[in-house]
Design a protein with these regions (language model features):
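Short hydrophobic alpha-helical segments enriched in small aliphatic residues
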Residues: 14, 39, 43-45
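N-terminal beta-strand motif that seeds the catalytic metal site of vicinal oxygen chelate
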Residues: 43, 47-73, 127-130, 187-223, ...
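An N-terminus-focused feature that recognizes amino-terminal "leader" regions
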Residues: 49-180, 185-191, 216
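Short, structured motif recognition centered on aromatic/hydrophobic residues
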Residues: 62-66, 80, 85, 99, ...
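Active-site region of the double-stranded beta-helix
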Residues: 82-86, 91-96, 228-270
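Extended catalytic-interface subdomain
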Residues: 127-129, 146, 151-242, 250, ...
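Long compositionally biased, domain-poor regions of proteins
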Residues: 259-261, 281-343, 347-356, 362-369
Length: 397
């Protein structure tokens, strides 16, 4: 038997909202395609997660899409073109466009009088929905409602897929999608465009994680939301303190390991989290991390396309060798591109960089993992201080 990875039992049981008895998590195996053939079951070309349904009751299997909206949708289209996300399909009856790169699907919803456009009126440029891949959407939706989730609006037209959704962070929607891969939702509801193959793609591959910014005192509520409905578990907890402000961050992950959501809460009323909440006019998704197999090439391509990145203090690179032992990266190349590095030779290396705010207060992260499954904890302090310095320059704090 070829076992790819064994993910150990996490050390903390979750807290549900409202309080529920703690659940027991079990270890599970990720097994290579073709290894198992129980009862003649057909294994698809994807890796299969074999586990007791109690471990993954919703059958999560990763992100299917992220849906964006804005008062000016053309600004989103221009941004996605700059990031290498070509428009590959358009909805058959609605003003919705699919932009794709690698296994990342971004939707721009500009349909008049839609939930998305009302969301744009409330928040400006924003993320109004995301789609979770699940084993059985109808069963997952039924379970979510039984556990207290609020259903989202039904907007499917004649001969269109009715994809169930529930309300999530800041009133955004979480769609439950069980058609993906070779037979997807886009085959039914979208028509392909004539987009040509792009040899200059920046090489973004997957949604690595996305973060939530929540109001003070709401972290337990939202971590409990994901624990209770999807059986997420906490895998990291951070307490970051700058010169004048600070934040807490709790990183949650799904049983399948493919949906990771750090939840951020401010320690005070002036931090970058509070600034986001004021500008966004509510809680929501702060940034989306997109993975690359070659972050140097990706950053070079994105910069050449005009995408701006957050700066990093020069002093950051002076301490890299002492902090990230045995990393074998060129400090000159890291510094030239302002790429951050974390980890160690033993724990693996993580490379990351953050764009400036590009959709209201929302920004993107570009990340490359070389055996490190963290979130750049060692960089949090440096990044926090960098953003705080910008806040001080702008007179926010």
């Amino acid at each position: 038997m070829a076992i790819i990875a064994i993910i150990p039992e996490w050390c903390k049981s979750g807290r549900a909202v409202p309080p529920q008895p703690p659940q027991t998590t079990r270890e599970f195996l990720v097994v290579e395609r073709g290894v198992l053939d129980y009862a003649g079951a057909h294994l698809s070309a994807h890796l299969k997660i074999i586990m007791n349904p109690q471990d993954n009751p919703m059958g999560t299997d990763g992100f299917e899409f992220v849906e964006y909206t804005a008062p000016d949708p053309e600004a989103l289209r221009a941004l996605f073109e700059k990031m290498g996300f070509r428009a590959v399909a358009r909805h058959r009856s609605k003003n919705v466009t699919l932009h794709r790169q690698g296994d990342i699907n971004f939707l721009i919803n500009a349909e008049p009088n839609s939930f998305a456009q009302q969301f744009a009126r409330d928040h400006g440029g924003s993320i109004c929905a995301m789609g979770f891949r699940v084993r059985d959407a109808a069963l997952a939706f039924k379970r979510a409602l039984e556990l207290g989730a609020e259903p989202g609006p039904t907007t499917a037209g004649p001969m269109e897929l009715n994809i169930p959704s529930i309300k999530g962070i800041g009133g955004s929607l979480i769609y439950l999608v069980d058609r993906y891969g070779a037979s997807s939702i886009y085959d039914i509801d979208f028509r392909p465009t004539d987009a040509a193959a792009d040899d200059t793609s920046p090489g973004l591959q997957l949604i690595d994680h996305l973060t939530h910014n929540v109001a003070r005192g709401q972290m337990d509520l939202w971590s409990g939301f994901y624990e209770r409905l999807f059986n997420f578990r906490e895998i990291r907890y951070f307490d970051i303190e700058g010169k004048k402000t600070g934040l807490f961050s709790r990183a949650m992950t799904s049983p399948c390991g493919k949906i990771r959501i750090p939840i951020n809460e401010s320690r005070d009323d002036k931090s970058q989290i509070e600034e986001y909440l004021r500008e966004y006019r509510g809680e929501g998704i702060q940034h989306i991390a997109l993975s690359s197999a070659d972050i140097y090439r990706t950053v070079d391509r994105l910069r050449a396309n005009g995408l701006a990145f957050q700066d990093t203090p020069d002093t950051y690179y002076d301490g890299v060798d002492a902090r990230v032992t045995g990393h074998q990266e060129s400090l000159a190349e890291l510094s030239r591109r302002r790429i951050l590095i974390d980890g160690s030779a033993q724990d693996g290396i993580l490379l990351q960089i953050f764009t400036t705010n590009v959709i209201g207060p929302i920004f993107f992260e570009i990340i490359q993992r070389r055996g490190n499954e963290g979130f750049g904890e060692g960089n949090f302090q440096a990044l926090f201080e960098s953003i705080e310095l910008d806040q001080i320059r702008r007179g926010v704090v």
